Structure formats: C-alpha cells, structure tokens
Regions:
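RNase H-like nuclease fold core
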Residues: 1-49, 60-63, 148-164
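RNase H catalytic domain
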Residues: 14-16, 56-147
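Short, conserved alpha-helix that lines the donor NDP-sugar binding/gating region
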Residues: 51, 55
Length: 164
C-alpha cells in the first residue's frame, strides 16, 4: 500500500481536573520504525471528548499539510467503538438529517460541536482516501504508545508538540 499513511489516535481524561491529553502517531507504509508523535492537552468534560479531540487533531493535521498528495491514503486506528461506528456505519447522516437531534427530536446534548467537526473533516478527504480501523484498546502496540503519551502529557507542563 504505497502512499499510505498509518495514523493511531488516543485520548486520556482526568475526571478531577476536567482535562484531557491527546496523542496521535503516524508513519508511512514501509517506515514503521520512523514514528512521528503529535500531542497536546486541553479542557474536556468527558472521556469520549478526549477521544474525539485526538481524532480531530489528527485529521486537521493531515488536512493542513502543505504539499499533500492527492493519491495519499490514510488509515486511522482508533479504539473508541462509538466513534468508529458513527463514521463507518454513517450514523452521522441521521443526525445531519435531523438537525443534529436524535430521531425522536430530542437534542444531542454532548459534544455536538466536536461530532460535527469530526464529520466535516472526514468529508473533506476525497472518497476512498480515508479509512478507519478499529483497534483493541491497549492491546494494539501503536494504541498503547499513543495512550501512554496522552496520559503522560496530562502530568507535564508541555505545549502541543510534534516529536520525530
């Protein structure tokens, strides 16, 4: 799979502080030993929010890369099943049709802005160039690495950073 970039994301959340750490790593096909980590922290109100932020940061990063090639494919490994299904099963279409309310008309209460941002970014990638892959939390080696960095960043006074 030449011209494929593999991305793994994870978020970590501290209930007491209402903060999250996020991390994503990436590497090019065939260059698994050349990992790049991108991480940061921000305020959050729930664990799912930290996972959403990690994926959004990754998508924003690759959408904004200068000189991005049209024929590049992206595979994103995520461990959050709800987010995986929301995109791959196209659950978001129902929310778009219903004005981001549930089918019974009740408003979606949590993280609506983040869910919408995720969908907007997902749609910015040409069809067939972005694939989500469900990975097992803390069992996939790249997920373990992003989890460790996301948890580590919560306890440090570091700014968002790219580490190669």
């Amino acid at each position: 799979m030449e011209n494929t970039t593999y991305i793994y994301t994870d978020g970590s959340y501290l209930v007491d502080d209402k903060r999250c750490g996020y991390c994503f790593l990436y590497f090019q096909h065939g260059l698994e030993n050349q990992l790049t980590f991108v991480f940061g922290k921000c305020n959050a109100v729930a664990s799912t929010e930290s996972e959403l932020i990690a994926i959004i940061k990754a998508l924003e990063y690759f959408k904004n890369l200068s000189g991005q090639k049209e024929n590049t494919k992206y595979v994103i490994g995520i461990d959050e099943l709800n987010i995986f299904k929301f995109i791959t099963k196209k659950v978001y279409r129902e929310f778009e049709i219903n004005g981001w309310n549930y089918s019974d008309g009740k408003p979606r209460k949590k993280n609506t802005k983040l869910w919408r941002r995720l969908v907007d970014l997902y749609k910015m990638f040409p069809e067939g160039t972005l694939k989500l892959k469900k990975v097992q939390s803390k069992k996939d080696k790249y997920n373990r690495q992003t989890d460790r960095v996301a948890r580590f960043i919560l306890n440090k006074e570091l700014e968002p950073y790219v580490l190669r």
